[in-house]
Amino acid sequence: MDTLSERIKWALTKPELPEQRDGKTKSKLRKEMEKAERVWGNNMIGQVDNGNWTTKLGEELVFDILNLKGENPRRPETRSRFKPDWETDNYIYEVKTSNWWVDGTAGEKVLGTWIKYQDIPEIYGKPLIIVCIARQEHELTYGKTKYFGEELSPKTRQILELAKSWGITYVPFSELCKNYNESS
């Protein structure tokens, strides 16, 4: 069963926040939606109760898109104790995925991913692309600290330019899958 279109739709479509109904609070409805998303995600990766389902789903989603684009994705070898998610003939990819119902500051660690992986371009001899999927993309587009879009602060622009000068770029998943999404 090919689930690519369904997975892309999940990654690009922020769900509506629940409204109180049927005597259930918004909080209770939110928990139900989070559980349903987790069950769906585990189904997409062929597992039952994997709490980290977004990691596998996001990585596989990026692999499938890169494969469709003819970029020859594969698992890179470990170098200097680093093992990024994917390597193609021209790039190294690190995938960051958040489910839609994660709360709090869970997604903030992606802001420093470029620092953690600052040496990857030199180690592998290829630029690093950090792909942000689902809520991770949404937060970096519409949240307090924007990495995507036109409304970047001057300091954030400086940070992203520094990362770029090191061979590191953040890319929203919507951009990575753009051509596939338009033709499907």
Locations of the language-model features?
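Acidic-basic catalytic patches of nuclease active cores, encompassing PD-(D/E)XK
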Residues: 1-75
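Residue-level marker for well-ordered alpha-helical positions
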Residues: 56-60, 114, 153-157
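Hydrophobic, Leu/Ile/Phe/Ala-enriched alpha-helical segments that form helix-helix packing faces
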Residues: 62-70, 117-124, 159-163
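Core catalytic machinery and nucleic-acid-binding channels of phosphodiester-processing enzymes
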Residues: 77, 85
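Beta-rich catalytic cores
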Residues: 82
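Conserved catalytic cores of phosphodiester-cleaving nucleases, focusing on short active-site segments
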Residues: 86-99
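Catalytic cores of nucleic-acid endonucleases
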Residues: 97-151
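Domain-level recognition of nuclease-like catalytic cores that cleave nucleotide substrates
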Residues: 129-184
